[in-house]
Curated annotation (Swiss-Prot):
InterPro entries: DUF167 (IPR003746), YggU-like_sf (IPR036591). GO terms for cellular component: cytoplasm. Belongs to the UPF0235 family. The lineage of its organism: Bacteria, Bacillati, Bacillota, Clostridia, Eubacteriales. It comes from the Bacteria. Disulfide bonds: none annotated. Pfam families: DUF167. This is UPF0235 protein Swol_0959. Signal peptide: none annotated.
């Protein structure tokens, strides 16, 4: 299986990348890559920030980081978001994706 190409960049201590969120899913999961962004399904509806909170919680649990180390920097009302995570390197993010999407 080829490694998905997720565009990432450093912003100081933070790793920045795009996420396409699909709310109201049957479970929280990474489903792969979508146009250079990480595609993630969350169970929460896109109402009053519930899907954003679910996304932050899911990523924090996935990477074993506190929620304060996950932030949405753009796209709070859109399905296309820019997310930053403090405490991981791009290699860890990219290496982790195939394990989930197989």
């Amino acid at each position: 299986m080829n490694k998905p190409l997720i565009r990432t960049e450093r912003n100081g201590d933070w790793l920045r990348f795009g996420v396409k969120v699909q709310p109201r899913s049957s479970r929280n999961q990474i489903v792969g890559e979508h146009e250079g962004d990480l595609k993630i399904k969350v169970m929460a509806p896109p109402v009053e920030g519930a899907a954003n909170q679910a996304l932050q919680k899911f990523l924090a649990e996935l990477f074993k980081l506190p929620k304060k180390d996950i932030r949405i920097v753009r796209g709070e009302t859109s399905r296309h978001k820019i997310v930053e995570i403090r405490g991981i390197e791009a290699e860890k993010l990219l290496a982790f994706i195939p394990q989930i999407t197989k």
